[in-house]
């Protein structure tokens, strides 16, 4: 997967430079509302229910300040990713018990006919496994800076 292909799932309206929420449930709701406000999902309540259900199976807080809540839902019409930052951090139940600051919400249609969902999840985890990339992402203040950081992570 190329940087451009990965970036095609993001968008300026799906870039949140500072989350207002300070709780896990609040973050999930705030990120789901980004998609709802954009008109990218059919039923915001259904989407939020799906995200919460997925979290109940086990936290998507990966550790090292990163959380990747994700899931497939009949509310989603297309695969989309929301990127959000929390400078203060949020207790997300991460594996290392550290607060999360970088959030990637991946939402895909229930019938993922393009088989995008799992490769996207894997690629994001791979990209943020690099400490230097995580540090640069914490400093982004615009969608342009975010896309540049992702391109650099791919060596482009």
Feature annotation, model-predicted:
Residues 1-156:
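Cytosolic covalent-transfer regions centered on His/Cys nucleophiles
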């Amino acid at each position: 997967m190329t940087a451009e292909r990965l970036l095609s799932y993001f968008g300026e309206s799906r870039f949140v430079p500072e989350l207002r929420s300070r709780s896990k449930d609040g973050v999930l709701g705030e990120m789901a509302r980004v998609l709802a406000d954009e008109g990218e999902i059919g039923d915001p309540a259904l989407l939020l229910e799906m995200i919460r259900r997925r979290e109940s199976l086990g936290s998507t807080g990966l550790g090292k300040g990163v959380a990747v809540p994700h899931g497939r839902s009949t509310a989603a019409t297309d695969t989309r990713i929301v990127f959000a930052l929390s400078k203060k951090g949020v207790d997300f139940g991460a594996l290392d018990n550290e607060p999360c600051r970088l959030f990637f919400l991946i939402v895909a249609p229930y019938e993922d006919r393009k088989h995008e969902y799992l490769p996207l999840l894997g690629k994001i985890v791979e990209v943020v496994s690099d400490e230097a990339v995580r540090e640069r992402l914490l400093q982004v203040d615009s969608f342009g800076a975010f896309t540049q950081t992702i391109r650099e992570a791919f060596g482009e």
